[in-house]
Every structure is written in structure tokens, then in C-alpha cells.
Curated annotation (Swiss-Prot):
Keyword Nucleus carried by entry: yes
Protein name according to UniProt: Putative zinc finger protein At1g68190
Superkingdom field: Eukaryota
Annotated InterPro entries: CONSTANS-like_Bbox1, Znf_B-box
Organism of provenance: Arabidopsis thaliana (Mouse-ear cress)
GO BP terms: regulation of DNA-templated transcription
């Protein structure tokens, strides 16, 4: 039991400096601090300055105080207050204490602890005022007097430092402020480094072109399908022996394109309102073949699906296999040249008809 009483009455050391006796309790930080460290910690910013703090009990030196007894000249917590004033001594003069915020000056702490301070003359320091304190009071409150004097030195040092910075920041009264034009002249000429030359770039950029409008060296007109659907190189000599066979102006659509190619259709409209749906199969190698105008394009892998031809006038579908309309990469050079020549003649004839 004796050991417990000794532990409860042990003086708490400041948790910040570990040197002085703790006299202040911060509720937000749950920390015991001395006066100097209390000012340093809670003057760092405005948020820390809002922390509620109170003085530690002078009796148990452990709990935050709630009342000051002027007869005992002590700050007391709830338990110590009941212990001292639970009997007939309840007539003692007491005053309830409230928590404080911010960073009070050292003189306010001196007044709170009951020391007489000369308020009329601010030039008189606390050290000069404390010289008039009785030796008995100095012995009893020597630790708090030391902390108050140390706090005053810190606050005076900070005030002198801030005033010197203010004086250095103020311009000389003999020096006129510069005009805005002169201030711009004094700035380093670093704007030239930010100039970027875009002359090497072409005026018409092709970065936004779609996949179907890619620029091919074989297609001077930069179009994927320049001729009509009839101009595609068809193996008329080998497969389509009937010279009267022609593809009419009809709508060409791929049925089951999602099942066949695994992608959504991307229609491209030409002059005859023909829609060509195509997709590249990523799981197979893409093979190149020659078209009627000798342009290498990519062909999807042949499949067993059907192509439905439906005229705009009639709704009777004609189903043909893909072998009916197919490209023949195995043609000889002479046959291909004949096909190209015939197609050029057809094209020239159409151009003349349009001009007429």
C-alpha cells in the first residue's frame, strides 16, 4: 500500500524534453508537458493551438486539475478536492478552472500561480518582479518560477526574431519601388527556352485517320475502295464463263458476321450504296492477295458461311457460296494483265459517260 502511494505522488516529467517537471496536461495529445515545451508544441500551427490544456494537480501531480484553492494555494483534481474539502473545510475559497488554448504569455501563467506582477510598467521583466518574492515562496514554487522565466526568455527571443525579419523585409524609405516594366526587365530571360519549333510538322496530320483511311503507297488517291464493286478482279475466265454475268446494283451484306468474324460490322458506303463488312481474324495469319488495281490488302480466312444477295426491288434472296465470287491469286501474269486492262477500259468509259 505504501508503494502505491509513493508511485501516485511521483512527479511526472515532461514527455517532450524529458528534463523539466510536467505542469500542463494536453487533452488532445494526452501528454504531460512543461510550460516551455507546451508553448513550442502548440505554437507550431493554428490547429495545434486549439488543443485544450489544463494544469496538473499540485497534490497528486498526476490528474488534471479542476479547481484552485486559494487557502491551500494549490491546483486540485476531483479526487484531491474531495479529499481536502470533503469535511468541514468546505468554506475555503475556491475557483473552478477552465481549459485554455493558444499560447498565453508568461505573465499570465505567473498571475495564475499567484505571483505578483507589475502590470503598470511592461518594461519590467518577470525576473525583476520575482526578486521581490519572499524566499519561502521561492522555495515552495521554485520549479514553476524557473519554468515561467524560461518561457519568458523563449517568447522574447521569438518576438525579437520576428521583428528583425519584419525590419529586413521592409524596403528602405529612400528606395522607391520599381515600376512593373523595370521588374520585368530584371527577370532572367528564360522565355526563349520555351519556344518550340513546329515547322517540321506537316499541316495535315494523319494521326486521327481511321484504319480504313490508311495511306497506302499503292493507292495514290488514299482510298481503300475507289472503284465500284464490279471493278474487283473476278476470275471471269476460269470460274465465271458466262460473259453476261454481272453483279447488279444490289445491297451486299454478310449474314452471321458476328459468328463468322467475331466483331461488329463497320460499314463503308461508296457511290453505289454498297456496304462492305470486314473483320480481321487475330487467331490466324493474314494473307495478302492482289486486287484488280494491284493493291495488297488483307483477306480474312475463307469460311463456309453464305453471302445473301437481295435486290431492292424484290425480296427473293439468292444464296451463293463464297466460291462463286472469289479472288484468284493463282492467275498467270498475262491473264492478270488482261483483266487489269479490261477494267481500265471500263473505268475510262464510265468517266467519259459522266463527262458527257
Amino acid at each position: 500500500m505504501l508503494c502505491i502511494i509513493i508511485i501516485e505522488n511521483m512527479e511526472r516529467v515532461c514527455e517532450f524534453c524529458k528534463a523539466y517537471r510536467a505542469v500542463v496536461y494536453c487533452i488532445a495529445d494526452t501528454a504531460n508537458l512543461c510550460l516551455t515545451c507546451d508553448a513550442k508544441v502548440h505554437s507550431a500551427n493554428s490547429l495545434s493551438g486549439r488543443h485544450l490544456r489544463t494544469v496538473l494537480c499540485d497534490s497528486c501531480k498526476n490528474q488534471p486539475c479542476v479547481v484552485r484553492c486559494f487557502d491551500h494555494k494549490m491546483f486540485l483534481c476531483h479526487g484531491c478536492n474531495d479529499k481536502f474539502h470533503g469535511g468541514g473545510s468546505s468554506e475555503h475559497r475556491r475557483r473552478d478552472l477552465r481549459c485554455y488554448t493558444g499560447c498565453p504569455p508568461a505573465k499570465d501563467f505567473a498571475v495564475m500561480w499567484g505571483f505578483r506582477v507589475m502590470d503598470d510598467d511592461d518594461d519590467v521583466s518577470l525576473e525583476q518582479s520575482f526578486r521581490m518574492v519572499k524566499p519561502k515562496v521561492q522555495r515552495e514554487g521554485g520549479f514553476i518560477l524557473e519554468q515561467i522565466l524560461e518561457l519568458e526568455k523563449v517568447q522574447l527571443r521569438e518576438e525579437n526574431g520576428s521583428s528583425s525579419l519584419t525590419e529586413r523585409g521592409d524596403p528602405s524609405p529612400l528606395e522607391l519601388p520599381k515600376k512593373p516594366e523595370e521588374q520585368l526587365i530584371d527577370l532572367p530571360q528564360t522565355g526563349k527556352e520555351l519556344v518550340v519549333d513546329f515547322s517540321h510538322l506537316s499541316s495535315s496530320s494523319t494521326l486521327g485517320d481511321s484504319f480504313w483511311e490508311c495511306k497506302s503507297p499503292y493507292n495514290k488517291n488514299n482510298q481503300l475502295w475507289h472503284q465500284n464493286i464490279q471493278d474487283i478482279g473476278v476470275c471471269e475466265d476460269t470460274i465465271c464463263s458466262d460473259d453476261d454475268f454481272q453483279i447488279p446494283d444490289i445491297d451486299l451484306t454478310f449474314r452471321n458476321f458476328e459468328e463468322q468474324f467475331g466483331a461488329d460490322p463497320e460499314p463503308i458506303a461508296d457511290s453505289n450504296n454498297v456496304f462492305f463488312v470486314s473483320s480481321l481474324d487475330k487467331s490466324h495469319e493474314m494473307k495478302t492477295f492482289s486486287s484488280s488495281f494491284n493493291n495488297p490488302i488483307f483477306a480474312p480466312k475463307p469460311a463456309s458461311s453464305t453471302i445473301s444477295f437481295s435486290s431492292s426491288e424484290t425480296d427473293n434472296p439468292y444464296s451463293h457460296s463464297e466460291e462463286v465470287i472469289s479472288f484468284c491469286p493463282s492467275l498467270s501474269n498475262n491473264t492478270r494483265q488482261k483483266v487489269i486492262t479490261r477494267l481500265k477500259e471500263k473505268k475510262r468509259a464510265r468517266v467519259e459517260e459522266k463527262k458527257a
